Amino acid sequence: MALLGASFQIGRSALAAYQSAIAITGQNIANVGNPNYARLSGRLTALEGGMTLSGIAPGGGVNLSGLQRHVDAAVEARLRMSASLRAGSQATYDVLSQVESLYNELSNYDLSTQLSTFFNGFSELQNDPDEITARNLVLDQADAVIGTLRRQRAALLRQATDLDAAVREGAQRANQIATEIASLNEEIVTQDARGPGFSAPLRDRRDALLRELSELMDIQVRERDNGAINVYVGSEPLVEFNHSRGLEVQTELSDGLSRATVRFADNHGTVVMSTGRLAAQIQARDEHLVGQLQSLDQLARGLIYEVNRVHSTGCGLVGYTNITGTYAVNNRQAALNSAAAGLDFPVNNGTFIVHLRNRSSGETITRQIEVDLDGIGTDTSLESLAQQLDGVPNLTAGVTADGRLQLSAGSGYEFWFSEDSSGALAALGVGTFFTGTDAASIDVNSTLRSDARLLAASLTGEAADGENAGRLAILGTQSSALLSNQGIQDFQARMVNTVASAAATAATAQEAADAVHSGLMAQREAISGVSLDEEAINLTTYERAYQAAARYFDILNILSTEVLNLVSTR
């Protein structure tokens, strides 16, 4: 009977082991559609048993000694790295493709076409300088350029603001993930102490969170002996066992823009990220968007200055009777080229000529005005410049309370300027075409809007003279010191080409990252994924084993009955 007892133990162990194996297979099948699930399998091991009457020891049955969770740590680490690169390249491409779409090149409404139309308008004005319609057309074409510059700048600012919001949202989610991982660490250690398999669902959840976190930022994971993990961003720990340092977002003002930065909540230290969606969004904002904003402002600044420089040295169908500069100085006694003066545009050592004409007689006098900025002796300030101009007969000059040059002709006189080698007229906004200093503030001078006759198409002030309009017409292709010695149209084309090239590079990087990630996902699926075909085979195997064990029990019951009958008949 003792031997039958051992046989019963073998049967009981088989029923228990294969019942558990069937349950594991069922769990795998139930989670076949769960992308975060890692396949489980039981480890069946033979039990030792006593010796039979024949002198052999067949064993004591079978035991499900452990539960294996099929995860390759190396593949998971590479998968997290590829997820970070993939999310980062996608974010970069999204930003650049939006900028590329914003510029809307190869259409009739892109900036390059509008700039060409604007400068061509001056060519048409040169051919018919006395025609008001041609003058109004130039002003309309200028408004088209201005509208596009403003719209593009506003769109870039909105995009930068949207990226800031995305960084805040991403950092908030990363903080939630880090907190949950710290909590899961503690739960996993507790569940592991209960026995094999208790922590498997928690580990699945933790691995899924790590993959999500890796999309936001590049992380390194180190598992501790107790099953908990530490998470690092760069060389800084983010999660250590059951403690998360936390993440926060701080706002910094730089280049006139509000920028969100990600920091550790405990010491406010900067979180150094090299890949991932957050790193890409921050980099795209700071390099691409801010860079494009600066380039757009530089383009507008160059356009304003170069057109104003030429326009201020020409004459319209009528001269000025009074004029107030559009740009003010901070200090009227400071040299015009000094930081204290605070002018936005350059002024050089040179001269310009003022022309004063009697409207009745046509008699014109000219005076050369010195702009002494050679750094020797007393350099020209706005105040001293006004004094020089005030010395011209029938011309009154002064400085307004807010630091702008103001000129008025005597009764019956008009004036204009020519041959300005100093750039002072353009820098002070005297006789200019544009106002403003960047893509946000650029506009057509209100004096031209009020009277298109003041558009300076002439150099001499004589009828049918369109020479200055011709000078304005070729500005689009002439190099400008304010545009890194490129022409206005070349500078704009290079801006667009830079974005297009960066977008193409980002698209290639995205495709490469997608390919690598897909390959690693396939590897993970082969290791951790559930195959219904394999599980069906396992289920059949375990089912038959269980049935055989049950049949084995039936046989043991029959033998037991026969033994008892033999004993009772004696």
Where are these regions (language model features)?
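Structural signature of extracellular appendage/secretion-system components
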Residues: 1-570
